[in-house]
Amino acid sequence: MFPLPFGNARYAPIAAEDQGRVIAAILNDSAEHAGKTYPLYGPKELTQYEVADILTQVLGRKITYVPVEIEAFSEIWKEMGYSPYIRQHISAVAQDCRDGVFSGTNDLVEKLTGQKPLQLVDYITKHKAAFTLADKTHTK
């Protein structure tokens, strides 16, 4: 079970390695990209319910998304000892997500890097050990 404050919002999660490849491509041809802004998205919009289903599929155990209000989430994290900064940051990201700021998809990762972005299921499969480790440890 994972309580998060994203409601039913849809967004297209992008893998860090895809972001890294985009950054490398831009740095390798900085003149071509000077002054440009690139909105980066993963390949498919998902809700947190769908993310939980993918986690369940890959990890082999039931993962349930529990939507909570942003304020309640911040309080839960406060009780867990998280800093005011991270609580404010996640709260702002959650509000932006609910407001549709992260909605949409595009093909910029592939256009800029020559590689299709990772699907979430592939990312979780590739990094399955990290998700298992997260069950055994809790860092703030």
Task: Label each PLM-derived region with a short phrase.
Residues M1-T64, V68-E71, E75-I86, A92, ...:
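Oxidoreductase cofactor-interface core, primarily capturing Rossmann-like NAD(P)-dependent enzymes
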Residues E71-K140:
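A hydrophobic C-terminal alpha-helical subdomain
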